Amino acid sequence: MKIHEYQGKQILKKFGVTVPRGIHCTTVEDAVKAAETLGGKVWVVKAQIHAGGRGKGGGVKVATSLEKVREYAGQILGMQLVTHQTGPEGQKVRHLLIEEGADIKHEYYVAALTDRATQSVAIMASYEGGMDIEEVAHKTPEKIVKVFVNPLVGLTDEQALTLAKGMGMNEASIPQCIETLKSLYTCYMETDASLAEINPLIHEGDGTVKALDAKFNFDSNALYRQPEIVAMRDLDEEDPDEVEASQFDLAYISLDGNIGCLVNGAGLAMATMDTIKLFGAEPANFLDVGGGATTEKVTEAFKIMLKNPKVKGILVNIFGGIMKCDTIAEGVVAAAKLTHLSVPLVVRMKGTNEDLGKKILKDSGLPIISADSMAEAATKIVAAVK
C-alpha cells in the first residue's frame, strides 16, 4: 500500500524527523489560503500522486508570490500528470501540498527498505539526492553507502555515523543526521513499511537537516495492525479493477496485453505470463485466485478481466492441489455463462480431480478449448486471438 507525500511527512514528523511546514489542499482557494497561513516569500506547490518524478513532469512548482501560488495550483490540480512511473496515461492530480520554501545547500538520499537478497533491513544513503537512485546505482554505485540492521539491536549510533559520513553530510549537520536516520529506521519498523524513503534529505544554511520528500510502501499483510495507516489509503490513486479484486481476495494486477490470465498460485501465474510472451503474445493481467477459490471468486475474476476492452481471450491455468480441479471447472462454467463469455477460452488443469474437472467442462456445452500442457495452452490461446 502507498500513501501521499503529505501523509508520509506527517508520519515522519511523528517519529521526530524534521519536515518543512506544509498544508494539504484540494482546491485553488485553499492553496492560496495555505500560502497565506504559512507566510514567507517562497512556497512550493506540489502535486500529490502515488508516483515519483513529479517535478520533471511539471507537478512541482516554486512560487514567489500568492498570485503564482494561485496560477500554479490552477495548472496542477486536475491535470493528468505523466511521469516515468505512471505510464503514458498519467495520473489525475486531486491533491496538493503547499509547503514553505527551504534554504537548500545540498540534497542527499536516504531510505530504509527490505533487502531481499540478505533478508534483512537495509539503510541506504547517498550524496546524490534529488534524482533517481536507480540511476545513481547504475552509473556511480560507489556513491551509495549501505548498512544492514540487526532488528534485535536496531540502528546503532556507529552505523548511523558511518552512513552520515559516507553520504558526505555537512559536518555541522552530522549529529542531527544521525538522529534523523535512527528515527527513519524506527518509523520503518513500527509502521510495518517495506520502504521508507526521503529523497531529498537536505541540510540548510544553518545546518538544519530536513526531509523535503517522503515515500512509503507498506506491507499489505501487516495492515490489520496498522489502522492509522489504512485510514490514509486513497482508492482514487489505485486501479479500480485492482481495488475491486482485493475485495474478493483476488491478487490482480492490470497489464497491457490482450490475453486474460486466471491462475492459482503466484509462481504459476508468472510462469503462465512468461509462456504467453514466449509464444508471441502479451498477458492482459496477473490474476492469482489463491488456494481457496470459490465459484463466486472465479466469476468475479472473469467479470474483472472482461471489463478490459483489450482482452481478446482468456487462459485458465490450474494446478489442483488444495484447490480441486472440479471446483475450478464449476466456477469457470458458471462464470462463462453469467458473463455471456464471447471471447476464446482455453483451460488447462492438472492435479486433484483433474478428470472430473475436464468432464464438467466437456459436458457444459460451452466452446471451451482444453489443453494438457502449459505450452499447448499458450499456443492455443495465442492462435485463437489472432
Swiss-Prot record:
UniProtKB keywords: ATP-binding, Ligase, Magnesium, Metal-binding, Nucleotide-binding, Tricarboxylic acid cycle
List of residues binding Mg(2+): N199, D213
Biological or metabolic pathway of the protein: Carbohydrate metabolism; tricarboxylic acid cycle; succinate from succinyl-CoA (ligase route): step 1/1
Top-rank lineage group of the source organism: Bacteria
PROSITE patterns, per the entry: ATP_GRASP, SUCCINYL_COA_LIG_3
Required co-factors: Mg(2+)
Record's catalysed reaction(s): succinate + ATP + CoA = succinyl-CoA + ADP + phosphate; GTP + succinate + CoA = succinyl-CoA + GDP + phosphate
Positions of ATP binding: K46, G53, R54, G55, E99, A102, E107
Domain ATP-grasp: 9-244
Transmembrane segments: none
An example Gene Ontology CC term for this record: cytosol
Keyword Glycoprotein: no
EC number, UniProt record: 6.2.1.5
Binding site for substrate: N264, G321, I322, M323
GO molecular function: ATP binding; magnesium ion binding; succinate-CoA ligase (ADP-forming) activity; succinate-CoA ligase (GDP-forming) activity
EC top class, as a word: ligase
Entry-linked SUPFAM superfamilies: Glutathione synthetase ATP-binding domain-like, Succinyl-CoA synthetase domains
InterPro entries, per the entry: ATP-grasp, ATP-grasp_succ-CoA_synth-type, ATP_grasp_subdomain_1, Succ-CoA_synthase_bsu_CS, SUCC_ACL_C, Succ_CoA_ligase-like_bsu, Succinyl-CoA_synth-like
Note describing how the cofactor binds: Binds 1 Mg(2+) ion per subunit.
Keyword ATP-binding: yes
GO terms for biological process, alphabetical: succinyl-CoA metabolic process; tricarboxylic acid cycle
Quaternary context: Heterotetramer of two alpha and two beta subunits.
NCBIfam families per record: PRK00696.1, sucCoAbeta
Function: Succinyl-CoA synthetase functions in the citric acid cycle (TCA), coupling the hydrolysis of succinyl-CoA to the synthesis of either ATP or GTP and thus represents the only step of substrate-level phosphorylation in the TCA. The beta subunit provides nucleotide specificity of the enzyme and binds the substrate succinate, while the binding sites for coenzyme A and phosphate are found in the alpha subunit.
Family membership: Belongs to the succinate/malate CoA ligase beta subunit family.
Protein name: Succinate--CoA ligase [ADP-forming] subunit beta
Species of provenance: Dechloromonas aromatica (strain RCB)
